[in-house]
């Protein structure tokens, strides 16, 4: 076969490379009458060709242009600049790496490709055989040998990515971890199969999930009796948490890697996929949207308040898309489409910040609510265990008296708020609450309520100052494997009934004053639908019991989820937690006052500034559709820009 070599860059002439021999070893005798053209060039020329014919705005090592003819096979372009860099990084000579590029290009001219794993295995196998005949080693051996380092590094990025959330608040670690994982898993242009992309991303997803949710198994060991029964499930629980992450948190990386799109479009796909996963976590299998990426911005009031515009969904889309766009700009050394993506997400963030600044201003307006006293008992779960019915009854009576005593002098207080499950007796809908009667103040208290059909609710009971229970709210989002058993063969400590969903409640304080609030029991505060969008409320009343989690990160992250709820809804939060953190939270997510973890005491306060945000007005699902449209529209513009 005849090989025509064109020296478009004179630097090539100093290398003694037999291009004709290399090309003929590839084709053998089958193409002895054929011709191929090899042009030896530099990064500038191959960059222009790569952009013109492949829509890739960057240089590459080799380009092949197949003519589809048995005589004129086609043209191969090889860049000396890229070959020199890659040869230096691989620790081989320029001549050896050039031989590989010729072999690689020749197989492209013969119709081989590497768009899928199966294609890559066939093509790489043939390349290795030819290079062995030429006396060169397997160029893919190092990649295969050291591939495990990428898995380790990806897993490490996942493990430390959770440090951006409370109580550490090292947001830059999360940003760098996502950027590092994106660089390893998504930034390359080569397409890989869905399953290979998934396997590569599993270490990040699994380690990210375990490092972020490990504290959930802490609850097993709070009470010795429960520990004896459920400790055996610790390891399966951690494995399950890892599997959860390997399924959900890898989706953005997998899609950005296995879908063959232009580099400038990838940030829109990646950010959109991150928002999709968060939206899915809001409702799939009862939902668990804990720690959206948006929450790493809570240390910055103006940035986090952009959630009042487009919610955690929108801020997650913007933050993750911005991270990906920065990586693509660095990886590709610029490019119009990459710069467009970067500017798009920066502008989106600035728009959110502008709206957030407005939300902060509005949150400082309005009249104060009624004075609420939060009671934080800090009773351990173990101390609630009784050995007999008599002990249990006596213990419950003692605890009622302790709760009354702990409330103290309430003459300057309008309402007394107790945390989740603090009332030691089960209540019926027509029962009275003696604590309210004794204090002569309306009381909101966490209790188990048994309705007339003997269904048991984890509830917020509301009693007037006469002691009469006038209303109760049953928790709607129950904790899987804790408050109910979604899988029959896996035991659960309780089997409670789910309530009817988000609603508005009120207390008539006097003739002209009514305190209107939205109840949220425990982790219901993490869901975007905690407040019905068409109703005005003075506050969200959130009762919780984080005694199960002690001083683990989960307790502090739960507090941040309440702050997120305040920002998204534009409604201040009054939060009573059994062991802390109890707090008054402004409508802008600002902590007005709080009782730390493990501190017994009371906290008096008022809230103001409740208003309607654009996020609450449109709702979670509408904003999800808007975000997806922006992802598609932005990606299309980036594609057209690159094209």
Predicted regions and their residues:
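Active-site-flanking alpha-helical
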Residues: 98, 107-112, 219, 285, ...
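Active-site catalytic loop in hydrolytic enzyme cores
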Residues: 218-240, 273-275, 279-312, 456-528, ...
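Soluble catalytic regions of membrane-associated enzymes that act on cell-envelope
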Residues: 355-480, 504-519, 523, 531
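CN hydrolase (nitrilase-like) catalytic-core segments centered on the catalytic cysteine
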Residues: 245, 272, 415, 421-445, ...
